[in-house]
Amino acid sequence: MLQEIIEGLAAALFPNRLGLPDLKEEGIDYFVGHTLDVALRELVSQVKLELSFTADTQSQLDASKLDASQAANLTTQSPIEIVREFAKNLPKVRLLLDTDIKSAYEGDPAARSVDEVLVCYPGTQAIIHYRIAHVLHELGLPLIARMITELAHSATGIDIHPGAVIGESFFIDHGTGVVIGETAIIGKHVRIYQAVTLGAKRFPTDEHGNPLKGNARHPIVEDDVVIYAGATILGRITIGRGSAIGGNVWLTRSVPAGSNITQAQMLATPLDVSAHQANSSHTNSANSTKQLSKEVPIAH
């Protein structure tokens, strides 16, 4: 059901490319209106299910023990009111997606057209799912939101938590293996490549050793940052504006604006120390052998 809803919403957002193949200009308004009506009605039924599930869960818990993130997800709005509020956000979603697609087209020399980016790129598919899911997440529907992003995860290999905050003009190139955690914050005009992880380094626990929910534990990536393939960035650290993070870098500390971080830089100090220690050990061993050969005759 959710897959059909997402397909309907995407078709309504981009009727000329994701709508009917024989759609005429004079029929666009009707198509968009009808498609939205069907998708939103089906979404109402899904919202009812989540709210029912939430109510059942709440009845089993002491409300005073809910943490801030759980409490924020409890809503008193009716399903129709929530979906109506969601629908009001769709024009904004379309505008954001336009910037994402434009960024991909301008940032990838292999892209022949914006249409190719829209219909072919897995990163675009994942971002469409994320943009829709994020609105639902903000409206207090974390289950539906997570299910939507997991549909994209299954289809593209790109795992974006709907709670992440991502600015305009976001481009994921290739995409397979990308992971963006729940509390990650990504600025404008950010480009990331395949197998990048924006994850948590550690998280606080309660007195029973259970992880606390909702704590900020993922990176903040400022505007105009590029993160190349295989980079792993962990913890609540900040990647300064205009920085470039090289391939396969393991990063657990903040870097200032304009930084250019490479794997060689990250490994330079440990490698130099290790090399020095190895050379020293080899030299000492050789000297010891020479000294020993002078002091003790070698048996033949």
Model-assigned labels for residue ranges:
Residues 153-273:
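Structural signal for interior beta-strand "rungs" in well-ordered beta-sheet cores
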Residues 146, 150-154:
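Core catalytic architecture of nucleotide-activated donor-dependent transferases building glycoconjugates
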Residues 1-147, 277-300:
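Terminal amphipathic alpha-helical/low-complexity segments used for targeting or macromolecular assembly
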